[in-house]
């Protein structure tokens, strides 16, 4: 049985979708950044069967549900310059690779426990020429600043990693003073917020509007005592 091939889509079509989507999000991209994002979509499609990166195979839907979805958090993080960012459970590199492309002033680290996915992330670092991107394999709760990663992080993000309370428990030791944890969620996670561990609280909740996607999305910022 042969694998189902992804439908072919003209790059110009994807580029126009990206132009329209970033305009709706009020994100200005250089030509180089736009090409990096389009190259990333192409590479996701090319290597998906090998690395099992995503169930989405249509390039248009990859652009919407992966790239624009990841970009939707950028306007809410605009004031954070020269940040150290950890993307937990990054998988195919989302949202971390997208953040590294559009914010070259950030140092972004991708984390996953699956070596095969870390290998893909490392390949993307080389192919997309992302000098501000690094990759670390292993369980986030076992990562130690100064050993596995250079230091603690200003922002720890996840897109599809775990229950919010579990995410906070596992990653809180990596939050730098003044930093916070950011979780991308679908429907508002009231039950998960109610289970947040002691010493953590929601600082703000933002409703995300993802262009061309009719689905509920939220961004939750959590602060922890250790980071204050």
From Swiss-Prot:
Gene3D superfamilies from the UniProt entry: Vaccinia Virus protein VP39
Enzyme class, broadest EC rank: transferase
Residues annotated for S-adenosyl-L-methionine binding in this entry: 89, 94, 140-141, 159
Main localisation: cytoplasm
Key words, A-Z: Cytoplasm, Methyltransferase, rRNA processing, S-adenosyl-L-methionine, Transferase
GO molecular function: rRNA (guanine-N7-)-methyltransferase activity
InterPro entries in alphabetical order: rRNA_ssu_MeTfrase_G, SAM-dependent_MTases_sf
Cellular component GO terms held in the UniProt record: cytosol
EC identifiers of the protein: 2.1.1.170
Pfam hit, one: GidB
The reaction(s) this protein catalyses: guanosine(527) in 16S rRNA + S-adenosyl-L-methionine = N(7)-methylguanosine(527) in 16S rRNA + S-adenosyl-L-homocysteine
Subcellular localization: Cytoplasm
Purpose: Specifically methylates the N7 position of guanine in position 527 of 16S rRNA.
Entry similarity comment: Belongs to the methyltransferase superfamily. RNA methyltransferase RsmG family.
Protein's name in the database: Ribosomal RNA small subunit methyltransferase G
């Amino acid at each position: 049985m042969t694998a189902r091939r992804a439908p072919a889509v003209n790059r110009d079509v994807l580029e126009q979708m990206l132009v329209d989507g970033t305009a709706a999000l009020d994100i200005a991209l250089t030509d180089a950044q736009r090409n990096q994002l389009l190259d990333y979509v192409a590479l996701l499609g090319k290597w998906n069967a090998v690395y099992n990166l995503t169930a989405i195979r249509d390039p248009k839907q990859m652009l919407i549900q992966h790239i624009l979805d990841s970009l939707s958090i950028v306007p809410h993080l605009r004031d954070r310059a020269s940040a150290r960012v950890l993307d937990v459970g990054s998988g195919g590199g989302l949202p971390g690779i997208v953040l590294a492309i559009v914010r070259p002033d950030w140092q972004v680290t991708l984390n996953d426990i699956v070596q095969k996915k870390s290998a893909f992330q490392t390949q993307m670092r080389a192919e997309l020429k992302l000098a501000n991107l690094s990759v670390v394999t292993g369980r986030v709760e076992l990562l130690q600043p100064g050993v596995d990663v250079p230091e603690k992080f200003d922002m720890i993000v996840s897109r599809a990693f775990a229950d919010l309370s579990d995410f906070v428990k596992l990653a809180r030791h990596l939050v730098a003073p003044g930093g916070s944890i950011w979780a991308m969620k679908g429907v508002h996670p009231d039950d998960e917020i109610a289970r947040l561990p002691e010493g953590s609280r929601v600082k703000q909740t933002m409703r995300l509007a993802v262009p061309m996607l009719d689905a509920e999305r939220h961004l939750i910022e959590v602060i922890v005592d250790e980071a204050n």
